[in-house]
UniProtKB/Swiss-Prot annotation:
Described purpose of this protein according to its UniProt entry: Involved in the biosynthesis of branched-chain amino acids (BCAA). Catalyzes an alkyl-migration followed by a ketol-acid reduction of (S)-2-acetolactate (S2AL) to yield (R)-2,3-dihydroxy-isovalerate. In the isomerase reaction, S2AL is rearranged via a Mg-dependent methyl migration to produce 3-hydroxy-3-methyl-2-ketobutyrate (HMKB). In the reductase reaction, this 2-ketoacid undergoes a metal-dependent reduction by NADPH to yield (R)-2,3-dihydroxy-isovalerate.
Annotated binding of Mg(2+) 2, by residue: 191, 227, 231
Cofactor note (record): Binds 2 magnesium ions per subunit.
Protein family per UniProt: Belongs to the ketol-acid reductoisomerase family.
Origin: domain of life: Bacteria
Higher taxonomy: Bacteria, Bacillati, Actinomycetota, Actinomycetes, Kineosporiales
Protein name: Ketol-acid reductoisomerase (NADP(+))
Gene that this polypeptide is encoded by: ilvC
Entry binding sites for Mg(2+) 1: 191, 195
């Protein structure tokens, strides 16, 4: 069983006596900065000149500096910008100011695990990663609850890295729900695998392929959309609330029987072997290398794949059908988790 941490395991004074720089003010950045401040931590936000987020942070009463200035002023530096931008930010703003005894924090271990960022030996390297989107992290904090976090220490130069990690997790409300001890390697590899094989890649491919099978068999695209994509939320919500068992308990006997007899025909042993291949590419660095090389070249392959995916017939069908659904929010103007390449 995983080792767990709760509020009583952390001393908030470990971090309230330090200045924390939160670099980035997107979904996680705003949640971390505001909750740290409300927990009594001295917070500054690091954003580039001209960033659209500067005004948002200042409106919340936060002090905004450039990433370089924020990193220089801080004892603790939390990096909350997209993975492929962290290397450049580190070289330009963090590394020149990463003096002995400081702490470098992440919410995902990608750049440490794959060696794109190599901090000096005399600083702490820590991860505090809420297992939920930023708006939920902030809402739960305000409501006196919290979103579970995972916590890791890659480098404990000061002997206080774990105490600081737990204090930070407590300050954003995470230990109200519970913190799980992990490592940078475990977090990074499992996170990437989940995204690629199940949550994003696996689910997207399954939905698209199901839609194709039905429409190629002569069924109407609108009906195929409902059966293969729209109703997925109903099933996932049941899993979210009570696991696969609750989903099976809640659906009809017909659906449950189909689950047992047909699910393994689609996701069979050969699929499991290919999932293992995906994991191997993550573990040996192949995925990270291909991703970073493409990003460094201006993301040509990434943009090509995105454009191709957006042309899939399921997208046009969905756009029309969602016009019938008054309860579905279609405006994405305030969506801040998305790609920096858009």
């Amino acid at each position: 069983m995983a080792e767990m941490f709760y509020d009583d395991d952390a001393d908030l004074s470990t971090i309230t006596g330090k200045k924390v720089a939160v670099l980035g003010f997107g979904s996680q950045g705003h949640a971390h900065a505001l909750s740290l401040r409300d927990s009594g931590v001295d917070v500054v936000v690091g954003l580039k000149e001209g960033s659209k987020s500067r005004a948002k942070a200042e409106e919340q009463g936060l002090t905004v500096l450039t990433p370089f200035e924020a990193s220089k002023a801080a004892d603790v530096i939390m990096v909350l910008v997209p993975d492929h931008l962290q290397r450049g930010l580190y070289a330009e703003a963090i590394e020149p100011n990463l003096t002995a005894g400081k702490a470098l924090f992440f919410s995902h271990g990608f750049n440490i695990r794959f060696g794109y960022i190599k901090p000096p030996a005399d600083v702490d390297v820590v991860m505090v990663a809420p297992k939920g989107p930023g708006h939920l992290v902030r809402r739960e904090y305000v409501d006196g609850r919290g979103v579970p976090v995972i916590v890791a220490v890659e480098q404990d130069a000061t002997g206080q890295a774990w105490a600081l990690a737990l204090a930070y997790a407590k300050a954003i409300g995470g230990l109200r729900a519970g913190g799980i001890k992990t490592t940078f390697t475990e977090e990074t590899e499992t996170d990437l695998f989940g995204e690629q094989a199940v949550l994003c890649g696996g689910a997207s491919a399954l939905v698209q392929t199901g839609f194709e099978v039905l429409t190629e068999a002569g069924y109407q695209p609108e009906v195929a959309y409902f059966e293969c994509l729209h109703e997925l939320k109903l099933i996932v919500d049941l899993m979210y609330e009570g696991g696969i068992a609750k989903q099976r308990w809640s659906v009809s006997d017909t659906a449950e029987w189909g689950d047992y007899v047909s699910g393994p025909r689609v996701i069979d042993a050969s699929v499991k072997e290919r999932m293992k291949d995906v994991l191997k590419d993550i573990q040996d660095g192949t995925f990270a290398r291909n991703f970073i090389e493409d990003q460094d070249a201006g993301a040509p392959k990434f943009k090509e794949l995105r454009a191709k995916a957006e042309q899939h017939p399921i997208e046009a069908t969905g756009r029309e059908l969602r016009k019938l659904m008054a309860w579905v929010k279609s405006d994405d103007s305030d969506y801040v988790e998305g790609s920096a390449a858009r």
